[in-house]
Amino acid sequence: MGEKLICNNKKAFHDYFIEERFEAGMVLKGTEVKSLRMGKANLNDSFALVRDGEIFLHNLHINPYDFGNRQNHDPDRLRKLLMHKSEIEKLFGKIREKGYSVVPLRLYFKNGLAKVELGLAKGKKLYDKREDMKKKDQSREMAQALRERSKSH
C-alpha cells in the first residue's frame, strides 16, 4: 500500500539539528483517524516526552472530525506512542543529556496505520539558523543564475 503523508513539521528542521529518526505508531480514537485521513492535523510546537517507560506526544492538534457527533475527540489530548522498549530507553537516555529533545517530523499512514516519525533533536543557536538561511539563499541564487544562463543560450 505504501505511505500517505498527512503533514510535515518544517519548523523542526529550522529550529533543530536532527541527529536520529525513529518511527512510532499512535494510539488514536476513531474520529481522530477519520480526521487524519482528511489531512487535518498540525505538528507545530508538538514534542514527545518519556514518562513511566512510555512515550507520549504533547501538543499534536488533530481537528475534530467534521461529521462527528458529541462524542468527538479532544483536539489537543495527550497521545500515547507505540515503540519498542529498547527504542524508548535509548530516547530517554538521550533526553536526559542536556540540549536534546524529541520532536515529531512528519505524520503519515503506512499500510493503513497512522505513524509519526520522531527526530532526536538538538536545538540550533541563532547563528546556526543564519548560516542555514545563507546557504539556502546562495543555492537559490545559483540555481536562478543557471536557469537564466540556460534560457539566454
Curated annotation (Swiss-Prot):
Disulphide bonds in the chain: none
GO CC annotation: cytosol
Pfam family, one: SmpB
PROSITE patterns with a match to the protein in the record: SSRP (PS01317)
A single GO molecular function term of this UniProt record: RNA binding
UniProtKB keywords: Cytoplasm, RNA-binding
Functional description taken from the UniProt entry: Required for rescue of stalled ribosomes mediated by trans-translation. Binds to transfer-messenger RNA (tmRNA), required for stable association of tmRNA with ribosomes. tmRNA and SmpB together mimic tRNA shape, replacing the anticodon stem-loop with SmpB. tmRNA is encoded by the ssrA gene; the 2 termini fold to resemble tRNA(Ala) and it encodes a 'tag peptide', a short internal open reading frame. During trans-translation Ala-aminoacylated tmRNA acts like a tRNA, entering the A-site of stalled ribosomes, displacing the stalled mRNA.
Family: Belongs to the SmpB family.
Region span, Disordered: 129-153
GO biological process terms on file: trans-translation
Name of the protein in question: SsrA-binding protein
Location in or out of the cell: Cytoplasm
CDD domains, per the entry: SmpB
InterPro entries from the UniProt entry: SmpB, SsrA-bd_prot, SsrA-bd_prot_CS
